[in-house]
């Protein structure tokens, strides 16, 4: 029976109504019910942002055909955002890649050749030759990988093992460097451990919400719906929103604050001063659980050492700090008076006071939320530290309804990039490569020679671009990311290195993205439920899903690619003789045998999979690969405050928030009665620090790396929109989402447009010192910049806004500031 969509919907409604009324079902409707019953449903976390919504995935005849919010998922409680409802369509774009493609001319690889289909063996042959040549001629520092906060946990773990242990290169970094690195360093400096202490359950218990550089209405809409429900159902609840431009979150705001870019640092210090001046410090908490330190200043902007701003900095890249007294701290913040703050920020005094009163009121439970406005900031780590100051001064932390909460943008920026440690300086469970004890722990667990993991921090994301351009990094593999579009300063610092004939670039992706088309070799990748996976969301919730369909054609998961490629290398080809002498039994073995097919990883048999359960990688290898990798990885955190539950528990649950101890998850860390690591009588214990105390930092305002001047007279801020996710490589292939927002526009204040003889809908050339793009003027709509600032989303591959942005970073976190550079406009 063939049914039109309209007939299907009508019959479906008839069937539902008849069933509810206890009536017999008409024949057509019975056929629909039969079709519905043929759909197989299973759970998965959403593929998009870091909220971690649970969805039910419907599959039929080997395809994902439906998706709905999971009513049993505690995060979203059955709701999806607009992107979540269209998840099935992200995998079925017309240009889905299904076989490897190599640039070739006259039957062999050529940097200027045309993309030509090849086999996986041919792809690995070329990769093997390029990797081995680079390793032999220039050593491990000449190869690198750029990964993703969209990797599954075991993909990130496998990649980290391959590079740090196998190839002995720490030149592996995730795209989370561009979004969450400042949050990581902020957590580590203040608390000694990464990730939030609270959870989403705080929303229903809070009295006030303060958004710092976070448009949750569009970027975290499900959480925003919970905040909206809390605000509208309780007249005593307050919402404050701070941003450099007006956006949809302002619609709910009781106090909507627009401030001059970079001056959020001033506001944060003003609030600390207000708390002290109004005797609002929680003295009991403060005296027992807090230390005070003064941080180094004038630390530069993470630009090339030859840049004038770096040469002028007194303490470039310094994260040094020294103890200070309370009286000295009080004097430090006293400079940030109401009058000075209003003048520097452009915010009216009454709005500043209203905001400060929320934090100072001992009867108000306050949650601070932030995302990229704080993190993508040349002083992003400082901004994180300064908001923690407010909660530590008042004791509004680690308790229901209270706390600072860094929201994440990718589905596993926490679970993979941060917890697994796929950053160039990190190892699992907050360990770092510079710590000999940490390296020793990993080397012993992985049964590799002592000294295998390099002590030198590898190249971070922006440094990788520079090293490619300079010819120091010659073989570069990117996975699950579209950095040619998403990263900063495309013209000056990225494209030159990618197209340099000295370098060989590999991109693993499901679609021909801007990055893929700039590469030399494209590897087709399995997506989402085409593989078994695990993500970790913003509230420390680890969630699993099973493979539910097979990938099209020859597309393979990132995990398969990493593991199979490791077979191409024997230990003596990648390790020096002095290492092999320490473990001669590893001589002659492949990296596959040493890293993945070990007794530790391969001990879980295929019989642990359900009889009809898809798992392409495990069935090919003969053991349950994902379980082996996860259990080995989870060992690092157990007993150290990062406890993950046993593997099988996650397939039964809708996620669990670590630390999971004795089968119980943790909602609030660091507080007695909530955290199993805090003993009776301790009250609070920030056990990431040796003395159990968190740190309040004295850190000043410092200006942005680039600000408007007479020629480049406007601030440019970049970001996202509700309908698209990051570079749009998935969402722009969903017809409904593409139609809803088909191309990027330049949001501009009407008076700024008028002064330049521009009208809504006009084409306009946006020009910075680094490049130019053509966009379309938008003087109305959802985003309303103040005079002097324009906003442009980065999802549109036809309008590469990152040709304009500056590659200035926070010197401590190495995270790029995408929110502040100077541009001018020219009418087209």
UniProtKB/Swiss-Prot annotation:
Q: Which InterPro entries match?
A: Asp_de-COase-like_dom_sf, CT_Nitrate-R-NapA-like, MoPterin_dinucl-bd_dom, Mopterin_OxRdtase, Mopterin_OxRdtase_4Fe-4S_dom, MopterinOxRdtase_cofactor_BS, Periplasm_NO3_reductase_lsu, Prok_molybdopt-oxidoreductase
Q: Which organism is it from?
A: Escherichia coli O127:H6 (strain E2348/69 / EPEC)
Relate the protein's function as given in its record: Catalytic subunit of the periplasmic nitrate reductase complex NapAB. Receives electrons from NapB and catalyzes the reduction of nitrate to nitrite.
Q: Where does substrate bind?
A: 794
What's the protein name? Periplasmic nitrate reductase
> What are the record keywords, sorted?
4Fe-4S, Electron transport, Iron, Iron-sulfur, Metal-binding, Molybdenum, Nitrate assimilation, Oxidoreductase, Periplasm, Signal, Transport
- Superkingdom of the organism of origin: Bacteria
Quaternary structure, from the entry: Component of the periplasmic nitrate reductase NapAB complex composed of NapA and NapB.
Q: What family is it from?
A: Belongs to the prokaryotic molybdopterin-containing oxidoreductase family. NasA/NapA/NarB subfamily.
Q: Which residues are the signal sequence here? A: 1-31
Co-factor remark = Binds 1 [4Fe-4S] cluster. Binds 1 molybdenum-bis(molybdopterin guanine dinucleotide) (Mo-bis-MGD) cofactor per subunit.
């Amino acid at each position: 029976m063939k049914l039109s969509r309209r007939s299907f919907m009508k019959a479906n409604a008839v069937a539902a109504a008849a069933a509810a009324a206890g009536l017999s079902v008409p024949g057509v409707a019975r056929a629909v019910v039969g079709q519905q019953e043929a759909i197989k449903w299973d759970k998965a976390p959403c593929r998009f942002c870091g909220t971690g919504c649970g969805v039910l995935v419907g599959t039929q005849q080997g395809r994902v055909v439906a998706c709905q919010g999971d009513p049993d998922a505690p995060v979203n409680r059955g709701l999806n955002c607009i992107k979540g409802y269209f998840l099935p369509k992200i995998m079925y774009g017309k240009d889905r890649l299904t076989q490897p493609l190599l640039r070739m001319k006259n039957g062999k690889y050529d940097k200027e050749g045309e993309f030509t289909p090849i086999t996986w063996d041919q792809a690995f042959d070329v990769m093997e030759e390029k990797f081995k040549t680079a390793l032999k001629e220039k050593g491990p520092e000449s190869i690198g990988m750029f990964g993703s906060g969209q990797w599954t946990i075991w993909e990130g773990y496998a990649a980290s093992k391959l590079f740090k242990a196998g190839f002995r290169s720490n030149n592996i970094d995730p795209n989370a460097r561009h979004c969450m690195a400042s949050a990581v360093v902020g957590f580590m400096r203040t608390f000694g451990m990464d990730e939030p202490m609270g959870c989403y359950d705080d929303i229903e218990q809070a009295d006030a919400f303060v958004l710092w550089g976070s448009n949750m209405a569009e970027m975290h809409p499900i959480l925003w719906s919970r905040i909206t429900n809390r605000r509208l159902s309780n007249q005593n609840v307050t919402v404050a929103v701070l941003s450099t431009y007006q956006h949809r979150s302002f619609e709910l705001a009781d106090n909507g604050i627009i401030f001059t870019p970079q001056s959020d640092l001033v506001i944060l210090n003003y609030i600390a001063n207000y708390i002290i001046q109004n005797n609002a410090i929680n003295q009991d908490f403060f005296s027992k659980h807090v230390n005070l330190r003064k941080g180094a200043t004038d630390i530069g902007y993470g630009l090339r050492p030859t840049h004038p701003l770096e040469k002028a900095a007194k303490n470039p890249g310094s994260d040094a700090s020294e103890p200070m007294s309370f009286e000295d701290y009080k004097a430090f913040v006293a400079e940030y008076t109401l009058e000075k703050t209003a003048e520097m920020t452009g915010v009216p005094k009454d709005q500043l006071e209203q905001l400060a009163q929320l934090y100072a009121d001992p009867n108000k439970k306050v949650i601070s939320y932030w995302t990229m406005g704080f993190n993508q900031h040349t002083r992003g780590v400082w901004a994180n530290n300064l908001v923690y100051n407010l909660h530590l001064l008042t004791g509004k932390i680690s308790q229901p309804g209270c706390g600072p909460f860094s929201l994440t943008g990718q589905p596993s920026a926490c679970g993979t990039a941060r917890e697994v440690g796929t950053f160039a300086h990190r190892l699992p469970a907050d360990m770092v490569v510079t710590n000999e004890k940490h390296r020793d722990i990993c080397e012993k667990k992985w049964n590799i020679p002592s000294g295998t993991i390099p002590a030198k921090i590898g190249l971070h994301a922006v440094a990788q671009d520079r090293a490619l351009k300079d010819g120091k990094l010659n073989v570069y593999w990117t996975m699950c990311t579209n950095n040619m579009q998403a990263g900063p300063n495309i013209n000056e610092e990225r494209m030159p290195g990618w197209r340099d004939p000295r370098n060989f670039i590999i991109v693993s992706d499901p679609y021909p993205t801007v990055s893929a088309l700039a590469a030399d070799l494209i590897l087709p990748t399995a997506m989402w439920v085409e593989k078994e996976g695990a993500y970790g969301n913003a509230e420390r919730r680890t969630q699993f899903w099973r493979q539910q369909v097979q990938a099209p054609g020859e597309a393979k998961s990132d995990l398969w690619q990493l593991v199979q490629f490791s077979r191409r290398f024997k230990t003596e080809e990648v390790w020096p003789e002095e290492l092999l002498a320490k473990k001669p039994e590893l001589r002659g073995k492949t990296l596959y045998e040493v890293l993945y097919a070990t007794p530790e990883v391969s001990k879980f048999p295929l019989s642990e999979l359900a009889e009809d359960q898809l798992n392409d990688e495990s069935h090919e290898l003969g053991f349950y690969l994902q379980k082996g990798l996860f259990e080995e990885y989870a060992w690092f955190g157990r007993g150290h405050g990062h406890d993950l539950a046993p593997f099988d528990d996650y397939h039964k649950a809708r996620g669990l928030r670590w630390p999971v101890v004795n089968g119980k998850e943790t909602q609030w860390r660091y507080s007695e009665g909530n955290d199993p690591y805090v003993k009776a009588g301790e009250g609070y214990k920030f056990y990431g620090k040796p003395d159990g105390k968190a740190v309040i930092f004295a850190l000043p305002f410092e200006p942005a790396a680039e600000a408007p001047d007479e020629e480049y007279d406007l601030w440019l801020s970049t970001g996202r929109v509700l309908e698209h996710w990051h570079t749009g490589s998935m969402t722009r292939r969903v017809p409904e989402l593409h139609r809803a927002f088909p191309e990027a526009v330049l949001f501009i204040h009407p008076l700024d447009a008028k002064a330049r003889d521009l009208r809504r809908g006009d084409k306009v050339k946006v020009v910075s010192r680094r490049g130019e793009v053509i966009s379309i003027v938008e003087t109305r709509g959802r985003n309303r910049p103040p005079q002097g600032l324009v906003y442009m989303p980065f999802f549109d591959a036809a309008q590469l806004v990152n040709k304009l942005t500056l590659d200035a970073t926070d010197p401590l976190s190495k995270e790029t500031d995408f929110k502040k550079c100077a541009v001018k406009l020219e009418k087209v």
